[in-house]
Amino acid sequence: MASESETLNPSARIMTFYPTMEEFRNFSRYIAYIESQGAHRAGLAKVVPPKEWKPRASYDDIDDLVIPAPIQQLVTGQSGLFTQYNIQKKAMTVREFRKIANSDKYCTPRYSEFEELERKYWKNLTFNPPIYGADVNGTLYEKHVDEWNIGRLRTILDLVEKESGITIEGVNTPYLYFGMWKTSFAWHTEDMDLYSINYLHFGEPKSWYSVPPEHGKRLERLAKGFFPGSAQSCEAFLRHKMTLISPLMLKKYGIPFDKVTQEAGEFMITFPYGYHAGFNHGFNCAESTNFATRRWIEYGKQAVLCSCRKDMVKISMDVFVRKFQPERYKLWKAGKDNTVIDHTLPTPEAAEFLKESELPPRAGNEEECPEDDMEGVEDGEEGDLKTSLAKHRIGTKRHRVCLEIPQEVSQSELFPKEDLSSEQYEMTECPAALAPVRPTHSSVRQVEDGLTFPDYSDSTEVKFEELKNVKLEEEDEEEEQEAAALDLSVNPASVGGRLVFSGSKKKSSSSLGSGSSRDSVSSDSETSEPLSCRAQGQTGVLTVHSYAKGDGRVTVGEPCMRKKGSTARSFSERELAEVADEYMFSLEENKKSKGRRQPLSKLPRHHPLVLQECVSDDETSEQLTPEEEAEETEAWAKPLSQLWQNRPPNFEAEKEFNETMAQQAPHCAVCMIFQTYHQVEFGGFNQNCGNASDLAPQKQRTKPLIPEMCFTSTGCGTDINLSTPYLEEDGTSILVSCKKCSVRVHASCYGVPPAKASEDWMCSRCSANALEEDCCLCSLRGGALQRANDDRWVHVSCAVAILEARFVNIAERSPVDVSKIPLPRFKLKCIFCKKRRKRTAGCCVQCSHGRCPTAFHVSCAQAAGVMMQPDDWPFVVFITCFRHKIPNLERAKGALQSITAGQKVISKHKNGRFYQCEVVRLTTETFYEVNFDDGSFSDNLYPEDIVSQDCLQFGPPAEGEVVQVRWTDGQVYGAKFVASHPIQMYQVEFEDGSQLVVKRDDVYTLDEELPKRVKSRLSVASDMRFNEIFTEKEVKQEKKRQRVINSRYREDYIESALYRAIME
């Protein structure tokens, strides 16, 4: 049968089917038939129903239907790679939505053919964000319609509701989607890799793109290459439905795809593991849901689910395996069922069509589910506009990531149109019979003098008239730019409701000004503002949320020391104060420089393009004398005392430093840049990194931490080669050590061909005998260096982290082109080494959070423990300074001090403020964790919440046991028991005599650093309501401001001499 299936639709093109009314009556059987013709190989198929079939007589009576949570789709990105964010809007009716969709602002542009409209879509994707009425619970089918009724398809997926009484909205109940021009659905497969059906009730067409399931892994690899940050945070990040990749990019990287246009009155069927995306041509209404066949069961068992959110859709496969694969049930439960999926095979129900040339006589609806699979499943009752609700409805299909923002985003001007090449496929007509099938295809945030920017933080609208002098970096002529990233700023003070999501963190590099030179930098805006929505609390701390990396609250541990025998420590208040002082100093400089414009006509003396022989006497005399050397007090800098570039060269110290770094995970001088991130996010390094004691001097292979995207992405173009040189098939690379300086690197990180990876290998600097050359982009020696394009040298890690630095030969990782680095970067002062050097040197990077001006050299930041992590296209590295690390820091459980009875602590009183109190008793309370049948979970249930057994008497259920849980709404839901968690509880007594029982997370010791939210609400108990009722604070009297007559009007009128005397 495998050989037969391979001959079916070998080109994996999207197929279109025209069933007769008789053929149309049996849904499950017809799905089996189209798979027997190979339709599933494309991942998408179109079915045109008979002309006499109508799901609804008229759509004139739906204008009052409410769209409860419309979303505005903000898209950021460029060059065919985009990320889509959703801003939740207030509820509206279909009538109101139609009026908006057909308005001049949102209506479909004029076009002569589909290819022209497609080009306009991809070019204007980032402008004028449209509104999508998505995920509206309900159906537009009339009650009497039985054929292909999306509300009751009667497939084996209905077993979920039959067995457990659970409905998952949008999965086994229908959803309505009201679209307008440019509303999109990003690349994704269905939840649990299910089938889906989509019917376009009325309105403008909908365009679909599809990648065949057998090539789905290739699309995933491409997406992970362009979005490594999201991929590291969640293996299945495409399920977030946020990633848009244009067909031009797919074609460029050889990803097979097809496209088709769905007209009103047509069905689209997506198949398991079929990646699809698309957009709406204008106002329309579609209805969809998921379904399953027996072929899906294997996909469901192996589906890779989203790991960053526990409320994503998850369906227990137990009932399906037990019923349809009983012979493999025990093997599957033991985790030994390692079946390899063949994407070319049709569903088992299609066997009859592979043996016959014509369809046998049709059976009635009672036989729709083959082999009586659905015996006992009854039709549910549905109203015209109401959803069929089960008795126990718990969850929804998905929670869209939204920002609740009341303001409208202003419409922007469209960029000039460009052509988008697309393939054409021949279309052949065929009769309505089933046998013949018709294949169809239809910049730097500078706070110094020299750069000034207008402040958009107080406005939600960004006018493109103000950005007319912004010129994006030119790309290669053969790769036409499809869209430019839209730079938006949302007023933090106007954000109403909860802020759930924020957009991209950084702005892509661009040349500002009207000139054509890429090095020219001038603008009227204060900073390069990222596309993000920021919430600002009472304390003024800027909080940036990012769904792709979890919930945005970065959990950060102590910075790790990279000296042998040293231990991790927390930063002292003095060090944090220094960072804060630097930040305030930068803000003062920023305020002073506002409005000033100075030409950058002269290169800074420390710019790498300045020839080495032109160094002034000033610079050569920077080396400190022994009397001038101060004793190093900061722990992170003590091992580096002999490595600062203002000290005399010390090759032995460099060698010792390199040897020390080689013994610490990840054992690569280049990968060290992401060391802090991996320790914080992943609790250290996985087994692929190995232990220092286990590493042999040579031939050890480990997995590099740096994605290939970090070497290929630059701010200068989009001609990217995502090849992975010198990487093995399992993603590992050999570690090599220089026999002269002992620096250790991955062959892939440094560009070492396998033939040269030997014990006699030497790094580029040692091979050139340039032992006294230092990195021109930082202040430290040691590490892995490569030659720059001006005969100077740079750290590979510095070149990776600085967006504008470019590897000329990507495979060899050299030379490094530093000529495109903006000059203002070289004026930034590193907060770590500015007190250790007399002059500014090197090139700094800045914190990626909002407008934070904190700057540091890459090597200094890496040594001090600043968290740097891979970012998504078109950026490279996302950097979090200590200032932004602290507010989001969740106290590590292991770092919490033990508390004893009688100890004075700080806790929250019932009045909402924090007071000192005393611990009077310690108790232990047990909480249960369960996973509900709809995929949701709870980890703070009391034992008495389990109603299926008496847990107080008999103890907790066995792990994995099915239980019944009484929820806070009084309903009882099915769930599986996960674990019981004994939690230490503390009974505290306040000075007013009141007592509370709290968890350890809600208690703070007196010597513990308090979060700002606690500091702002910390009070002292007193008998008086107002402490200062009888005392007054000394008020510092300021000199009265002198009143001066406006000189412009001094001579315009006559005033009395007395009045003039008073005024002056």
Swiss-Prot record:
Record-listed Phosphoserine modification sites: 523
Look up the EC number in the record and give it.
1.14.11.66, 1.14.11.69
Q: Where are the zinc fingers (C2HC pre-PHD-type)?
A: 772-805
Source species: Pongo abelii
Q: How is it modified after translation?
A: Ubiquitinated by RNF8 and RNF168, leading to its degradation. Degradation promotes accessibility of H4K20me2 mark for DNA repair protein TP53BP1, which is then recruited. Also ubiquitinated by the SCF(FBXO22) complex; leading to proteasomal degradation.
Where does the UniProt annotation locate this protein?
A: Nucleus
Its encoding gene is what? KDM4A
Which residues are noted in the entry as Fe cation-binding? 188, 190, 276
Tell me where in this chain the PTM N-acetylalanine is found.
2
User: One GO CC annotation, please?
Assistant: chromatin
Q: Which reaction does it catalyse?
A: N(6),N(6),N(6)-trimethyl-L-lysyl(9)-[histone H3] + 2 2-oxoglutarate + 2 O2 = N(6)-methyl-L-lysyl(9)-[histone H3] + 2 formaldehyde + 2 succinate + 2 CO2; N(6),N(6),N(6)-trimethyl-L-lysyl(36)-[histone H3] + 2 2-oxoglutarate + 2 O2 = N(6)-methyl-L-lysyl(36)-[histone H3] + 2 formaldehyde + 2 succinate + 2 CO2
What name goes with this protein? Answer: Lysine-specific demethylase 4A
